[in-house]
Amino acid sequence: MLTQYHRFSRFLNQTYVAGNETALFGLLNMPNDLVLVRHGASEGNLAFAEEKKGNYQVFTPRFMETHESKWRLTRDGRNQARAAGQWIKENLNIFFGAYICSEYVRAIETASLLDLPHAHWTRQVFLRERNYGRMSGLPYAE
């Protein structure tokens, strides 16, 4: 079993291939530019926004039983991801050396909906939000 150190070390020393392009991504080959895209609005974002308005109806049994890593994008979140991808294609028409996203469903959905040419996404455990264990997904009041 790989330790987190070994997984992180392997992550920092990978070669990425996209189409006819190859990029090294390691300590000595770090990119000059870094483009970060946050996931679009998710079920969790919607639930906590509604809670701030005093609406607790969104905290259904289904929502409460779903681990935060499985929260999906909302319709608005899918539209946000498509719009971000369109903006990137129109304004940053460059080859990216690596395409990396979190293993969370909402991040994977966002990556896919960006629809970037030649993107071969790598899921990385180190790119995720904080997890508060059993407290994750609870209304703030609790």
Describe the residue ranges of each PLM region.
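Active-site-proximal alpha-helix that buttresses catalytic centers in soluble enzyme cores
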Residues: 6-21, 25-119, 123
